[in-house]
Amino acid sequence: MKIAFLSNKLTLRGTEISLYNFADYNEKYLGNTSVIITRDYYKLGNARDIHIDAYNKFLKRFPVFYYVEQPDIEEIVAREGIEVLFIEKAGSWEGLIARNCFNIIHCVFSARQPHGQVYSAIHEFINEDSQTNVPIIPNMAIVEESSEDLREELNIPKDAIVFGTYSGKECFDIDYIRKVVEDIGSNPAFPNIYFIFLYIEQFGPPSDRIKFLPGTTDGIYKRKFINTCNAMLYGRDGGETFGLSCAEFSLCDKPVIGRAEEHSRAHLMILGDDMIKHTNYDELYEIVTQWPKHNKDVSNNGYKKYTPAYVMDIFNQYLPK
């Protein structure tokens, strides 16, 4: 079966990581053929979050076809003999569909406007929030294998306590969490506490113990980044409808430190008591500065069930027979 996977642009963020994983394991696990449909990087100008490295990663692995308008998608479907179109989208009806094949819509934020032959969501939270009952095709959680870290490269002592995160560039935006990072990272009383950020916009005054790194598609580098950390310091206002970065840290048995309440609560639902929670500056400050007291074993956390086999078996149930 030939399946096309569509996103309206390719970025370093979780939606396109998810799309890549589905396309990859559609071939590796289900034995189908995968192609990618998206818009041309060079025609998108300064569209938010697009990244040439993401395009190059997809181009290296899959045939990639570009559309400008909706009829172009149907032309690609007809020309390439595509039987199923899997579309990652927010969830609303915006006309993006192919009327000449079977469509699986994969909703990332809401599920209130059903369309396509299968209208699904990435986590049960979306059903709860949208007051719907659509099928759930979850994202899968995958990390590369590596035992190495970045401590020597980043001049971080082996015995230092390191908190880190990666996400969208603007997605470390809870004020009191940023203030904790700034205050501890600049306080000489805590010379052994470091903070590292991958693909996060720089904030606060410069400090040798607060390090900002560019985004990457290199899975081994991301695994080394995770291995460098004692824990993930989550800081996105609004929360997650799945939380792929939380999943990747959790697969590596790294505790996730996060705010106790968010609008989008999928990461809280999945991790439950395995998440180390706070509600204000003082609570987080105490967690970070007294880390050995708060560290916990999270080796049986809820993200570990989202293996490629588990997810692709669900995905396969919704393919046309």
Regions from the PLM with identified roles:
Residues I82, N227-T241, K254:
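Acidic donor-binding loop of glycosyltransferase active sites
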Residues F109-S110, Q117-S146:
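Donor nucleotide-sugar binding/catalytic pocket of nucleotide-sugar-dependent glycosyltransferases
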Residues S7-R13, Y20-D72, E201:
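N-terminal strand-loop element at the rim of the active site
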Residues P255-R259:
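Short hydrophobic beta-strand element within catalytic cores of glycosyltransferases
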Residues R223, C246-L251, R265-A266:
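Short alpha-helical segment that forms part of, or immediately flanks, the ligand-binding pocket
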Residues N139-D208, F212, G219:
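Conserved catalytic-core segment of nucleotide-activated headgroup transferases in glycan assembly
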Residues T279-Y285, T289-K321:
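A charged, aromatic-enriched C-terminal amphipathic alpha-helix characteristic of glycosyltransferases
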Residues Y67-I73, I200-E201, I210-I226, G239:
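Conserved active-site histidine-acidic residue motif and adjacent donor-binding/catalytic loop
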